[in-house]
Amino acid sequence: MSKKNNLLVAASGTGGHIFPALAVSKEVEDEWNIHWLGVRQRLDANFIPKKYNLRTLNIKTPRKNIFLFYQYIEILISTFQIIRILKEKKINLVFTTGGYISAPTIVASKLLRIPIIIHESNVIPGMVTKYFGFLCNYVLLGFKKTNSYLKNCKTIFTGTPLREQFYKFNFLPEWVPKGRGPLLIVMGGSQGAKAINQILYESLEFLIKKQFRIVHIIGESNQQPFHVKNSKNYIQKKFTNEIAALIQNCDLVISRSGAGTINELIEAEKPSILIPYPDSKNNHQEKNALILAESGGSVLINQNKISKEVFEETLERIFKIKSKKGKNHYEILDLMKKNMENNNKIKSNNEIKKFINYFLKEF
């Protein structure tokens, strides 16, 4: 048996960085020894399997202005730490998905002449891709539109890798509320979304009265549980590993619009109400949401426009019953479903595996 080469996966922070990297790691783990580099006090340790040899560095949250002198000093210190790790683990290739850890990892790898692949999931590239992408051998894109923002990079459209369960059908978990009412999945990403949680709490009485069934994923942040009378149709969880099953089997998703969520909705062909995170860098969540809103598969509501009244009116419009040939159906929801079916799907995991394994020929 030939000796495996060593792949360093640098991904940290939110699920939007971690989950695509996990999907790729699982896809290539038979050909590579996986070593994972993350940041202390982030979500990393909760999600990274022990077999991926997680190492963490103490990297602070980047300031808004990437050109601040002391921020470069922090990157420089981290770069030397990563150089030591790259040498120690005899890394042959680096794959990163952005986040705090990516910039010093790219610089360190370039100094050691180790090939680098970065994946950019968002329509608008993040700061690391924008300012350090030209140092990478390839910049893999989740959306074709992103190419126009990266003129000095070698870009290839691959789509965004998803967790394997999204590529197969999953049955609805037993703990989901039973009944005939429409099933809503409400979530705010891996860290939660206070604004989405709040608007749902305000509208719970309306939702229960209308016989909606609700699964509410509040996120890993310190959200207080919310209790409501007669809540058999409402279930709240901080996190679930069964998110693919929930999205595949629900009627509508209400969520932020991170790149991972957008691609999960495309794969599941699921209609949605998207409420972009207003403070995302370069307003990238709104640009992501527009991909689905412009196709007619989603309703986009900016956070500064959302209210109890707007939220409830939007749901009433989507779930307004129309009669056709003696049968009742949700005309708007059905149209949104049809529009979601028209979005192009690509199994990105396989595409990215091809590029990673291409480098095996070089060693």
From Swiss-Prot:
Q: What does this protein do?
A: Cell wall formation. Catalyzes the transfer of a GlcNAc subunit on undecaprenyl-pyrophosphoryl-MurNAc-pentapeptide (lipid intermediate I) to form undecaprenyl-pyrophosphoryl-MurNAc-(pentapeptide)GlcNAc (lipid intermediate II).
GO cellular component terms attached to this protein's record: plasma membrane
Q: What EC designation does it have?
A: 2.4.1.227
Q: Which organism is it from?
A: Prochlorococcus marinus (strain MIT 9312)
MF GO annotations: UDP-N-acetyl-D-glucosamine:N-acetylmuramoyl-L-alanyl-D-glutamyl-meso-2,6-diaminopimelyl-D-alanyl-D-alanine-diphosphoundecaprenol 4-beta-N-acetylglucosaminlytransferase activity; undecaprenyldiphospho-muramoylpentapeptide beta-N-acetylglucosaminyltransferase activity
The lineage, from the top, is: Bacteria, Bacillati, Cyanobacteriota, Cyanophyceae, Synechococcales
Q: Where in the cell is it found?
A: Cell inner membrane
Q: Which Gene3D superfamilies match?
A: Glycogen Phosphorylase B
Any idea what this protein is called?
Answer: UDP-N-acetylglucosamine--N-acetylmuramyl-(pentapeptide) pyrophosphoryl-undecaprenol N-acetylglucosamine transferase
